Amino acid sequence: MATLDPSEIMFTPFEPKTKNRFIMYAEGVPAYLIKTANRPSIQFEEIVLDHINVKRYIKGKGAWQPIDVTLYDPVVPSGAQSVMEWIRLSHESVTGRDGYSDFYKKDVTFNMLGPVGDVVEEWVLKGTYIEAANFGDLDYASSDPAEIQLTLKYDYAILQF
């Protein structure tokens, strides 16, 4: 049974990571355009082993889940232009030409920062591409900044530290 020792809680150095201290690097997308992003997540298939009157379960294949990223869309440099340049590597709307995966898949890096700006956690998403892009809505009644929502799909993620 676990026991709770107050001295462990009160006198153990503890500095939580905070959600607002991160930098995301994706080739062709300026890091300061990124407003929000999800950290990687993985989900495993379930394999059922039936035997007489019971079921046993084991883990099946793992699938890394897509992440959602929100970008600001400034006048210069245009966030929409940066996103479309990445999309054009996989599909050119005018000609209908698709690109090889080697052209449009990129490595994306997430760094979580400590209080003094040091990197305390680093994720590298391998083989990342844009699965969906939503260039946002417009509204005469709002002064909110324009935003772009991206869904990024990737092959796998590596937690460096």
Walk through the language-model features, giving the residues of each.
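Glycine-rich, low-complexity intrinsically disordered segments
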Residues: 1-161
